[in-house]
A protein has these predicted regions:
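Substrate-recognition/specificity elements adjacent to catalytic centers across diverse enzyme folds
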Residues: 2-7, 11-305, 310-313, 328, ...
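Terminal end segments
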Residues: 29, 37-40, 44, 550-616, ...
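Gly/Pro-rich active-site capping loops and adjacent beta-alpha segments
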Residues: 82, 91-133, 139, 358-409, ...
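Second-shell loop/turn segments in exported
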Residues: 92-95, 143-155, 438, 448-454, ...
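Stable alpha-helical elements in mature extracytoplasmic
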Residues: 115, 139, 143, 154-157, ...
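Glycine- and hydrophobic-rich flexible loops that cap the catalytic core of alpha/beta enzyme folds
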Residues: 270, 284-286, 290, 325-346, ...
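Hydrophobic alpha-helical segments
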Residues: 420, 424, 433, 470-574, ...
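Charged, long alpha-helical assembly modules
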Residues: 639-723
């Protein structure tokens, strides 16, 4: 039974307050007014804002909570990071749930509603198609099937976290302290459950896996262009691109599995001409990451250093929530710090007092689209091996704010749910064909148990064994330990296909393209203590072509991985022992290796041509450029606009605007075409656009005209950061500019980097807004587990809090803060909260 008592301590007396709850409409208006009033104060008078905000930010120092066995103390440091000290794991997870909810409740609820397909319930009919899509994905159903795989002990910990969440929700309801977003949208949060926790954990799988849209892109493109053009733009990883585990590390050569796609393409001639509309879900922005680990033989401390900066959407509040969990008793011991997803217990990425770990997106192809043949006499039957099989039909009802409920059937074949009717841009796309999505995220898994085991692992063997339980999303795990071990391992379930390479949709009426299992755990790529003394992973190709299984057909452009390797090899060659500050500087590196390579090809094409004065000045700026994508420089602006114009000139007319915007592997393909054309190799794409020289010259001239429209006609006043910028955007601010300016007063902040630099910052090509980056960065020296990190824009989801965006400027200025891992670093905090067990237990 839920029990909570609130003690307001004033003059050492306990005071019970009567809570006033206004009528809903009045309360909604009051809170909207609060947003405007305090947002205005924040925008114009920061000091007054800081004083007044305390009226609406809870400052309780003590709570009495049922279910705790001992007192728990939470210390909040100067960045609002909770350091939770408890006597057992159940108590520490309950406290984690409580304090996380205090900071991120509305974000947690929105994540839950997204994955469960329940956004229309509070946001109205515009989100119906989005809800249909996620109901079809059925991630919450696979999460539900996963619960039985978890141990009783882990389920108990997870329930403790949920109890902590629900305790705070009830407390906030009683004192009318729910986040203001709930009042404005006129609803209250429901209790949190283990199913909610596991469901939103699968949002990472969704965020990191979009191969099914890539399959549709390739097939639609293959129908629009001839075979010669199509062959030129098949996925291709550069021959000089770095590989995380090259052949020389494997110590052996094995025969690679042969997979072709010719029959697949020939069997798809009946496919609909309207499939391009399915790509509305896709995005140019792809989620990546940087990670590397350095042996102690190359560090000043003599212990390994690990660096990690996962790339994900830049949003407010941050995707990540920083937390420190400390438990110390005779039977249970844990001291772990890092980040997690709000609503999920434990630490997903970080370090304890013995090991550190990080991840990057593996890019494994874990999704396939199957073209299912429906029985014309029975719409719930599909052909398989000459017979009609009954599909599972789940009748869904979507509640919609302001209108009647919407009934919606989810049809699930042997390969997965039919998704072809619901993929679109806020509209239902009806197709003759039936596409079923097979995805490793639709299988029952116990990923969170693996991560909770990692939190308490003390060495490589324990860490590796924990990964046996891990399935999705497929990640590259980087590891370092106090004993000097450094390692890399692929974690997750990667399918083994009977046939095909995952590039295109395949017929589902027989077993020709079936999955026949997953790559065995012992055969997943792994390297421990390599002779070179470091390991780098930056979404580049994972392993050489002698590996017997197909992991993926396409990888990120190799520039980030190549640059990290370059910096590490230089330090080692100079015999310079690395310290944590050196590695932080590497994370902040803005050298554009793409420009280093391509300008040697592109600039000479311009020299024989007559240019106007402004164009000539732009060429001089590029000639003098050090190829660093710094925010204050004009050269990055000229270069990136020029490169983009080359892409547009090559592909847009032939592909059409829609397909061009959804183009897969655009960077690798474009750069390879430029390199080959410069070497004299014939390119049909360049020939169709007027020839290599014409494309390069005209693209340059067009890009200069575009920049003039943006920043005037003096190139020496142009700045990359005037276009390329970071901005903290609360979801409410995206819809209403006035409210957005009040909630996010810092406005646009110039930032360096780009989509090819180690300091990654991919952006909207129309607005320059940063879309994808590394909101959380970490560097850890295993000597005394000294860690530094940053989490932009901040810890709190409350836009009235100082911690809402206090890390934004640190992030833009490429600064990290020292983690307060030792008790003496955080126990003197003035922000101390005690959670006391109820006497009525």
């Amino acid at each position: 039974m839920l029990y909570i008592q609130y003690n307001a301590q004033k003059n050492n007396k306990t005071k019970t307050s009567r809570v006033y709850k206004p009528f809903p409409k009045i309360k909604k208006a009051m809170n909207l007014g609060r947003v405007i009033f305090y947002g205005s104060i924040r925008a114009f008078n920061q000091n007054a804002y800081r004083r007044l905000r305390e009226h609406f930010i809870s400052l309780e120092k003590e709570y009495v909570i049922s279910g705790l066995s001992e007192e728990v103390i939470i210390y909040k440091d100067n960045r609002g990071i909770p350091h939770i000290e408890a006597s057992n794991l159940n108590d520490v997870y309950k406290a984690q749930g409580f304090i996380t909810t205090k900071d991120r409740l509305w974000q947690m609820d929105m994540s839950r509603r997204l994955v469960n397909g329940r956004l229309s319930e509070i946001l109205g009919p515009d989100l119906i198609n989005n809800d249909k899509l996620f109901r079809s994905f059925s991630l919450f159903r696979s999460a539900q099937k996963s619960i039985c795989l978890y141990s009783e002990e882990t389920l108990e910990w997870m329930q403790s976290y949920c109890d902590g969440v629900n305790t705070y929700i009830e407390h906030a309801k009683k004192l009318n302290r729910l986040p203001v977003e709930f009042t404005i949208l006129d609803y209250e949060p429901e209790p949190w459950s283990i199913l909610d926790m596991l469901s939103i954990g699968r949002l990472l799988s969704y965020s990191l896996s979009h191969n099914f849209t890539n399959e549709i892109f390739r097939f639609e493109l293959q129908k629009k262009i001839d075979d010669e053009l199509f062959e030129e733009i098949k996925p291709n990883y550069p021959s000089d691109g770095p590989i995380t585990i090259p052949d020389y590390m494997m110590g052996e050569n094995v025969k690679i599995q042969q997979q072709t796609s010719e029959k697949t393409i020939n069997n798809l001639d009946f496919f609909s001409d309207h499939l391009a509309e399915l790509l509305n879900l896709s995005s140019e922005v792809t989620k990546g990451s940087n990670g590397w680990v350095i042996s102690g033989k190359h560090t000043k401390s003599g212990k390994p250093i690990l660096a990690n900066d996962p790339h994900i959407e830049m949003q407010a509040p941050s995707t990540w929530y920083q937390t420190h969990l400390k438990v110390n008793n005779e039977t249970e011991n844990m001291n772990v710090i890092g980040v997690t997803l709000p609503g999920v217990c434990g630490i997903i990425l970080g370090h304890n007092d013995k090991i550190a770990w990080g991840v990057t997106n593996n890019r494994a192809d874990v999704q396939d689209l199957f073209i299912e043949k429906r029985n014309p006499s029975n719409p719930n039957q599909f052909q398989y091996k000459g017979k009609w099989e009954e599909a599972e039909v789940i009748e869904e009802v979507i509640k919609v704010k302001g209108q009647a409920d919407v009934a919606f059937p989810v049809v699930v074949t042997r390969h997965g749910p039919i998704i072809s009717d619901v993929i679109g841009n806020n509209q239902q796309i009806k197709l003759k064909e039936n596409l079923a999505l097979q995805w490793n995220a639709n299988y029952p898994t116990c990923d969170l148990e693996a991560l909770l085991d990692i939190n308490r692992s003390k060495n490589w063997e324990e860490f590796r064994n924990s990964l046996r339980k891990y399935s999705t999303p497929v990640l590259n795990f980087l590891f370092a330990s106090e004993d000097g071990t450094i390692a890399y391992r692929v974690g997750g379930k990667i399918p083994i296909r009977n046939k095909g390479n995952g590039l295109l949709p395949v017929p589902g009426c027989d077993d020709e393209f079936e999955w026949k299992g997953f790559i065995p755990f012992e055969e997943l790529p792994e390297v421990v203590n390599p002779k070179q003394g470091f390991i780098v992973s930056a979404n580049n190709k994972v392993i050489g072509d002698h590996y017997p299984y197909m992991i993926a057909s396409s990888w990120d452009a190799p520039y980030r991985a190549k640059r990290i390797n370059q910096m590490l090899r230089k330090s080692i060659a100079e015999n310079t022992p690395l310290v944590i500050e050196d590695v932080k500087i590497m994370q902040d590196d803005t050298l554009n290796l793409q420009a280093v390579q391509l300008l040697n090809i592109l600039l000479p094409v311009l020299y024989p041509v007559k240019h106007n004065k402004l164009e000539t000045e732009c060429i001089r700026i590029l000639q003098k450029w050090d190829c660093k994508d710094t925010s204050y420089n004009a050269a990055p602006l000229i270069y990136h606009f020029w490169w983009w114009e080359i892409c547009c000139t090559l592909f847009k007319e032939k592909m059409g605007t829609f397909l061009f915007e959804k183009m897969v592997d655009r960077m690798n393909i474009t750069d390879e075409l430029i390199r080959k054309a410069a070497q004299g190799n014939d390119s049909t794409w360049f020939n169709n656009a007027g020839g290599f020289e014409k494309v390069i010259i005209e693209s340059f001239k067009k890009s200069i005209i575009t920049i003039i429209d943006l920043q005037g006609n003096n190139p020496y006043e142009w700045k990359w950061g005037e276009f390329h910028h970071f901005i903290t955007k609360h979801p409410f601010g995206k819809k209403n500019k006035f409210i957005g300016n009040l909630i996010n007063p810092q406005g646009k902040i110039p930032i360096g980097g780009s989509y090819v630099t180690v300091a990654l910052a991919s952006y909207d090509r129309k607005t320059g807004h940063i879309l994808d980056g590394a909101p959380w960065r970490m560097v850890v020296d295993l000597k005394d587990c000294l860690g530094m990190d940053i989490n932009a824009p901040g810890q709190s989801g409350n836009f009235l809090s100082h911690w809402y965006d206090d890390q934004s400027l640190l992030y833009v200025n490429q600064q990290l803060e020292t983690q307060k891992f030792k008790p003496e670093q955080y126990r003197n905090s003035k922000m101390k909260v005690k959670l006391k067990p109820s006497k009525s237990m």
